[in-house]
C-alpha cells in the first residue's frame, strides 16, 4: 500500500506540474467533458460554474447524476472525466479504495473550511442535544431515526457503522436514506411542528440559512472537524486533455460563492446554469484567475471568449 501511495502521489504531482505550465489546445477527443453530480446542491452549483466556462471555451460539458460509488467506479473505468465533489474526510473510504491505489487522481483542492456532520434544529439543541452522546437520551422524541442522504453516500456509510457498532448507544436506531431534497422536506416538516429531528447537515448549503440549525459535536472520529473538497479526475486525464486539465487545476471556489449561487436557485427559482451565469457576470474578475494559462478548444484566448459568451 505504501508503494502505491507513493506512485499515486508522484503521478498526481506530475500532472499538476503539467497543469501549471501554459496550456495547449486540446484534441477534439477532449471536446466533451464528462462530469458527475451525486444530486447535491453544492456540486450542482460548482458543476454549473464549470459548465458555463467550458461552454464559453467551446467544450461540451456532459453531466450525469450518479450515486457516489458509481462516480468512483466511473472515474476508474474512464466513463467519468471529472468529479468536483470529493468531500474529505467524509469520503476517506473511497479515497483509500480508489485514489490511494492510483486508479483515480485527486487532482486539486477546490474548497476549504467545510463542515459535514449531524445537525439538529436550534430548539432541539437548546433542549440539551448538543453532542452525539446526547441523542439516545432523547431517543423517544427522535423516534430513534437519523435522516441521511442517498444510499451509498459516504456519510451514510459512517452513520451505518456508528449504528452497527452501537456507538453513543445508537445501536437500535434507524438510518433513513433518501435524496437530499427528501431529507430536507422531512426536516422542514418536523421544524414546523417543533418536533425533534436529527439529520445530516453541511456547509456550504442553503439549509444553513433556511433552517435555524446547530451542528453536533462528538462525531469527529467519523466526520472529522472542518474539511476540504477536492477535484478528482480519471487517471491520465490531465495528460490527454492538458487545456481542460489546467482549467480544473485553477477552479477554486469559496463558501460565499457557492452559497450565493445556491441561494439564487432556491430563492429566485433559477436553474443552476442561470444562477452560475449571473454570478460570473457580476464577478468577472474570477474568470481571470480560472482562465490563467487556459485556451479555447481551438487554441484562442479563453478569457475573451468566455466574457463574450456571457
Task: Give residue spans per PLM region.
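C-terminal functional modules
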Residues: 255-310
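A bilobed periplasmic-binding-protein/Venus flytrap-type ligand-binding module shared by bacterial periplasmic
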Residues: 115-126, 227-240, 263-264
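Short, well-ordered beta-strand elements
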Residues: 27-42, 59-64, 143-147, 248
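Pocket-flanking alpha-helical
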Residues: 47, 64-102, 182-186, 205-212
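Immediate post-signal peptide segment of exported/extracytoplasmic ligand-binding proteins
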Residues: 24-34, 55, 137-143, 288-290, ...
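Ligand-binding pocket segment of bilobal, Venus flytrap-like solute-binding proteins
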Residues: 80-84, 154-221
Amino acid at each position: 500500500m505504501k508503494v502505491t501511495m507513493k506512485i499515486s502521489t508522484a503521478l498526481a504531482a506530475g500532472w499538476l506540474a503539467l497543469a501549471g505550465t501554459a496550456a495547449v489546445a486540446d484534441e477534439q477527443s477532449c471536446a466533451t467533458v464528462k462530469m458527475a453530480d451525486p444530486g447535491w446542491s453544492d456540486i450542482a452549483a460548482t458543476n454549473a460554474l464549470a459548465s458555463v466556462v467550458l461552454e464559453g471555451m467551446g467544450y461540451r460539458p456532459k453531466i450525469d447524476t450518479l450515486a457516489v460509488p458509481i462516480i468512483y467506479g466511473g472515474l476508474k473505468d474512464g466513463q467519468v472525466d471529472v468529479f468536483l465533489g470529493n468531500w474529505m474526510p467524509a469520503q476517506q473510504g473511497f479515497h483509500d479504495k480508489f485514489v490511494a491505489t492510483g486508479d483515480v487522481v485527486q487532482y486539486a483542492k477546490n474548497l476549504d473550511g467545510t463542515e459535514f456532520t449531524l445537525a439538529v434544529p436550534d430548539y432541539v439543541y437548546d433542549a440539551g442535544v448538543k453532542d452525539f452522546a446526547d441523542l439516545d437520551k432523547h431517543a423517544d422524541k427522535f423516534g430513534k431515526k437519523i435522516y441521511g442522504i442517498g444510499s451509498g453516500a459516504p456519510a451514510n456509510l459512517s452513520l451505518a457503522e456508528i449504528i452497527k457498532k452501537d456507538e453513543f448507544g445508537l445501536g437500535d436506531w434507524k438510518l433513513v436514506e433518501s435524496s437530499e431534497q427528501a431529507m430536507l422536506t422531512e426536516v422542514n416538516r418536523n421544524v414546523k411542528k417543533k418536533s425533534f429531528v436529527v439529520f445530516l447537515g453541511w456547509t456550504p448549503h442553503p439549509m444553513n440559512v433556511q433552517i435555524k440549525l446547530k451542528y453536533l459535536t462528538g462525531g469527529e472520529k467519523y466526520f472529522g472537524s472542518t474539511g476540504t473538497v477536492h477535484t478528482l479526475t480519471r487517471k491520465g486525464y490531465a495528460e490527454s486533455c492538458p487545456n481542460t486539465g489546467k482549467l480544473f487545476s485553477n477552479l477554486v471556489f469559496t463558501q460565499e460563492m457557492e452559497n450565493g449561487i445556491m441561494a439564487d436557485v432556491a430563492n429566485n427559482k433559477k436553474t443552476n446554469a442561470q444562477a452560475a451565469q449571473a454570478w460570473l457576470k457580476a464577478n468577472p474578475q474570477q474568470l481571470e484567475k480560472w482562465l490563467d494559462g487556459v485556451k479555447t478548444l481551438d487554441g484562442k484566448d479563453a478569457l475573451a471568449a468566455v466574457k463574450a459568451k456571457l
